[in-house]
Amino acid sequence: MHERYVPADVEAAAQGDWRAADAYKTKEDSQKPKFYCVSMLPYPSGKLHMGHVRNYTINDVMYRYLRMNGYNTLMPMGWDAFGMPAENAAMANGVPPAKWTYDNIDYMKGQMQSMGLAIDWSREIATCKPDYYKWNQWLFLKMLEKGIAYKKTGTVNWDPVDQTVLANEQVIDGRGWRSGALVEKREIPMYYLRITQYADELLNDLDGLGWPERVKIMQQNWIGKSFGVNFGFPYELDGEQKLLRVFTTRADTIMGVTFCAIAAEHPLATRLAQDKPELLAFIEECKRGGVAEADVATMEKKGVATGFSVKHPLTGEPVEVWIGNYVLMSYGEGAVMGVPGHDERDFAFAKKYDLPIRQVIASEGQTYSLDAWQEWYGDKETAVCVNSGKYDGLRYAEAVDAVAADLKAGGFGDKQVTWRLRDWGVSRQRYWGTPIPIIHCPSCGDVPVPEQDLPVVLPEDLVPDGSGNPLAKSEAFLNCTCPKCGAAAKRETDTMDTFVDSSWYFSRYTAPDAETMVDARTDYWMPMDQYIGGIEHAILHLLYSRFWTKVMRDLGLVKFGEPAKNLLTQGMVLNETYYREDAAGKKTWYNPLDVTVTHDDKGRPVGATLNADGQPVVLGGIEKMSKSKNNGVDPQLLIDQYGADTARLFTMFAAPPEQQLEWSGAGVEGASRFLRRVWSFGYGNREALAARAGFDAATLGDADKALRREIYSVLKQADFDYQRLQYNTVVSAAMKMLNAIDGAKGATPAVLRETYGVLLRVLYPVVPHVTFELWKTLGYADEFGALLDAPWPKVDEAALEQAEIELVLQVNGKVRGALKVAKDASRDAIEAAAVADEAFAKFSDGKPAKKIVVVPGRLVNIVV
């Protein structure tokens, strides 16, 4: 054993032992309770960041603690390897996305291995490998058979210069991110999955999940179950009687309708624009810019009057129809009723275009004014109908019922439940993704690829150039024969949304070598007992994976309907930021390692200079580590300097897992110093610790009893904290243990060995390398087996027993000392000891005790 703790040597030795023993390869075992813990698989971007380190360490700590407690634990890893960043990198570097992706996987896998993670690498998957995405294609075809997958036209962002479809995030201020061209909206055929068919189940099943309430609320809002009324405004056009249908949750305000707005893509807008160039021009303008709902919510609301009116279904009054750029064809009916008196967006629109505003609800004590919008105008809790004829005086629920009944009686509509959730469009006009297994035949139309011909393999040697999908130019991929008639045909060149890849990978981990999508092993491991990932995945990934799981269940592939019982959303890792701003307002950000900070006498930062030139930089505050703010810390540099155990210890100690973690160089140094103390104690007491002498607890001296009492008392709390995932206080407990052991005077070697062994096991899940080596070197492995599977230490309840207890001694309510009495001392004995104590004699001024108050186990107060 070396005197000095050298992390690189210790970690290399431990990892060598683990590799030799294939320590983390896991099999099903019906004799043990199972625990399946999964970190959301990473995108292979090139390097791990500190957020990865924190996530995977949390998972690893959980794995190791539960394995020591007798669980059959599994921690797999894979790569979410398809996606747009690989295409962008390919264009920038002139290499195929496949090469960029596989190179990154190799590097990041090496980084993970250097962290000492308990990953079963035999289960590794990469979603860009044909043996994985074959099953994306297979399940897609099954969903097509069941009508869950279907094809319809959808609106996309089109870059007219690059001749390609853009994702919403590639549209910046209405322009293509590469070309700078004004983006257009285009309608193209795409495949969708009927997630709306599962809306009720997705909503209701949230109640049974051990997920953060915040995440469940986000999903509830995204699913967006609404109770309202679907009805139509009648009109006549081209000799036909029709209804302009809308949905509203505020039917109580129907008498306040002064206009209707329709989407630019609405069939009525198309018809009305046939002979009106100004309408056609506005429709074309609406087609430029992004199609994201968020873009629509923040952009300037514009409209144009069509000169056409529909009729109010209850009054028969004409209602003017406008085309509005804020109305989305993909939501609701593509039309909305305009109630400017009681909807903030409609109010602003009406003020802009001088449309009538009508008050039809009122709240007691409030005065309505057209001058400016007030929050209560949209209130439905306390409001009653006014200026609404027969509905006057009705409150919200009563008014909705009455209006719905009248609309139904008139044949215009009825109550309806609607959902904010929309079917999942899975077609992407991109190369680096799962090919959609469809063949286009001139005679047979769209033909599914036969199951025996799966997978449709994506060529990995193409290099995107930004001008359209490379698959459309690859004759080898594109040309095929129709499986129905044998004629020459073309393959579908769209690929699947990468959220498909991440919707079921955790099930494939359980049976990575299966010749079917999943097998019986999947029902052994799934659902995940613990899923770990960032809050940014609260909606799309987690919702899609829940939907995908339910589809797999309904197809008879699995027996469970939810992918994860419990979810932990770890907090972000934050760091200081520093920048300079030029005359044009552009900020240049500097890494904290390149900056020297000055502090005041209270340790608060008051200034900073750039090391390169000694000139000032601005303190930007603490923000999430990111490339854009250049405030990241390279985990590899940290591991190279301090070792993986120090990185792990700091990330677990600095904050509870679910809270934000503020980076601290001093905190990292403190973690390293603590591990050196653990090692130093082991080295300095190696002979005493290695001696396997037993002891009789009943005959131990006071020093031994006190040490055991302290260690087992702290162990009790540490065990509880492990169970509730409060790993920061587990580390605090270990620090208390080391202080107690290191400071124990007169403790025997046997008790030191026992208590130090407890410390090593408590620390092991957090810092596995140093504890593993100390455990082996000091002979614990010979007695208990390798630390990987050593039994978790049990609290010796007898050691917690005390013959004497200490009570606070007060005189007239003020603390004057401490009183030691027998644990089972009677009240009379406690009172006698109190008045006999020196503290009473000193602070009672010779006065006798009038009253003695005894609070059992806590204090004695003598009143004089």
Swiss-Prot record:
Primary localisation category: cytoplasm
Alphabetically ordered keywords of this record: Aminoacyl-tRNA synthetase, ATP-binding, Cytoplasm, Ligase, Nucleotide-binding, Protein biosynthesis
Biological process, per Gene Ontology: leucyl-tRNA aminoacylation
Organism name: Burkholderia cenocepacia (strain HI2424)
One cellular component term from this protein's GO annotations in UniProt: cytosol
Catalysed reactions listed for this entry: tRNA(Leu) + L-leucine + ATP = L-leucyl-tRNA(Leu) + AMP + diphosphate
Motif ('KMSKS' region): 624-628
Protein name: Leucine--tRNA ligase
Pfam family membership, one: tRNA-synt_1_2
Similarity-based family: Belongs to the class-I aminoacyl-tRNA synthetase family.
Binding site for ATP: K627
Transport keyword on record: no
GO MF, any single term: ATP binding
CDD domains: Anticodon_Ia_Leu_BEm, LeuRS_core
Residue window of motif 'HIGH' region: 42-52
Protein's cellular compartments: Cytoplasm
Keyword Ligase carried by entry: yes
